[in-house]
Amino acid sequence: MKSELTVPLIQLAPWRVPADCELPEALRPWLLEADSMTRRLRHHNRHFSVQLLGNRSVTLCADEQQLVAAEQPMGLCREVILHGDRGPAVLGWTLFAEAALQESGLRELGEQPLGERIFGDEPARRDHLQLACFEIASNPWCPAATVWGRRSRLFLGQWPLLVHELFLPSLSCNKELE
């Protein structure tokens, strides 16, 4: 599915469980965060915003289709950039089955953070945390770089969502990571 994103990426290695990865020490707390990434970014930044890059239909890979419980290989993708004090910090995209759009309120999200909806009042369910490195091409939000990312399955009510978060170079400049 990643070839359909706004920001060109090449995944350098398959998704792996955290125990099988040598993580950069500065990114470890971000990659392994169990709570909301929105909440973490807000905690470490005075300024936080979500830039919606788009919502579109995409072809899901077999493992993506299974993780989001899609009956068809077509799914939906919501792509965003999360901004902090130093600019674009996280490229995020969420995959979900088309049925989830109608029933979960995802259609009305706009630039509201998904994390606020998922981690709202009730404890969120997360599983299938996996990590990988990506080569990201130069784009309007960051220079070309090798970046770490994670994906995990979160649930919005009964609906499984496959949430991807890539940590952009400007995040490593944050003093909280040192």
UniProtKB/Swiss-Prot annotation:
Catalytic activity: chorismate = 4-hydroxybenzoate + pyruvate
Single biological process term from Gene Ontology: ubiquinone biosynthetic process
UniProt binding sites for substrate: M37, R78, L114, E165
GO molecular function: chorismate lyase activity
GO cellular component, as recorded: cytosol
InterPro entries in the record: Chorismate--pyruvate_lyase, Chorismate_lyase_/UTRA_dom_sf
Keywords attached to this entry: Cytoplasm, Lyase, Pyruvate, Ubiquinone biosynthesis
Cellular location(s): Cytoplasm
Domain of life, source organism: Bacteria
EC number assigned by the record: 4.1.3.40
EC main group: lyase
Residues in the signal sequence: none
Involved pathway(s): Cofactor biosynthesis; ubiquinone biosynthesis
Biological function: Removes the pyruvyl group from chorismate, with concomitant aromatization of the ring, to provide 4-hydroxybenzoate (4HB) for the ubiquinone pathway.
Family: Belongs to the UbiC family.
Protein name (Swiss-Prot/TrEMBL): Probable chorismate pyruvate-lyase
Species of the source: Aeromonas salmonicida (strain A449)
